[in-house]
Design a protein with these regions (language model features):
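SAM cofactor-binding core of SAM-dependent methyltransferases
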Residues: 40-120
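Active-site flanking residues adjacent to catalytic metal/cofactor-binding acidic residues
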Residues: 88, 117, 136-138, 157, ...
């Protein structure tokens, strides 16, 4: 049965990719804090991919919508020692944990600007065409708003990246038509 074997291959491939990525100790500590808070994080392989993108495009400035405990922030910053990150989260508790994470990771405070508030509202007050990368790890109902903001914030040639872009394998399935999946599908 081809479909069954394809699914096995997919699971094996994902496991291989996830097991292949190594995570620095400071990011492991951030992941532990996120688990304690009940905050979903990106996987180590996704983090490594984000760091690669930052490096590949030579990003100097980035915006992150959805700080959480700082796991994805740290991965973005792994991509370049020159990156300046503005990270936004609506949960002050998460921001406080992330700030502690950044401090314990030894990051210079000039590299990270952590802002509390609704990401869409905060991004509305940020400079146009001033960022090389926008990473969106936010609630699914906000994806369209964040994509619109990202397109305004990005310099020509800038990159927008989404956490969970395939929305837990729902986006490729045309039979799934709920609003959240449709939002991700249109964004991708």
């Amino acid at each position: 049965n081809y479909a069954y074997l394809t699914m096995i291959d997919k699971v094996s491939s994902w496991k291989f990719a996830e097991d292949f990525a190594t995570e620095p100790e400071h990011i492991k500590q951030a992941r532990f804090r996120a688990e304690q808070l009940g905050v979903e994080t990106i996987t180590p392989a996704t983090g490594a991919q984000l760091a690669f993108i930052v490096s590949a495009i030579g990003a100097k400035t980035a915006v992150e919508a959805g700080t959480g405990a700082g796991v994805s922030s740290l991965w973005l910053l792994e991509g370049s020692e020159k990156l300046i990150l503005t990270t936004i989260d609506s949960e002050p508790e998460y921001q406080n944990v992330a700030k502690q994470t950044f401090q314990e990771a030894g990051l210079d405070s000039s590299r990270v600007r952590a802002m509390s508030g609704d990401a869409h509202r905060v991004m509305a007050n940020m400079a146009d065409a001033a960022y090389d990368l926008v990473f969106i790890d936010a609630e699914d109902q906000d994806i369209d708003d964040h994509l619109h903001s990202a397109s305004r914030l990005l310099r020509p040639g800038g990159v927008v990246a989404f956490a969970h872009a395939l929305f837990r394998d729902r986006v490729p399935d045309p039979a799934i038509r709920d609003e959240a999946t449709a939002n991700f599908r249109s964004a991708v």
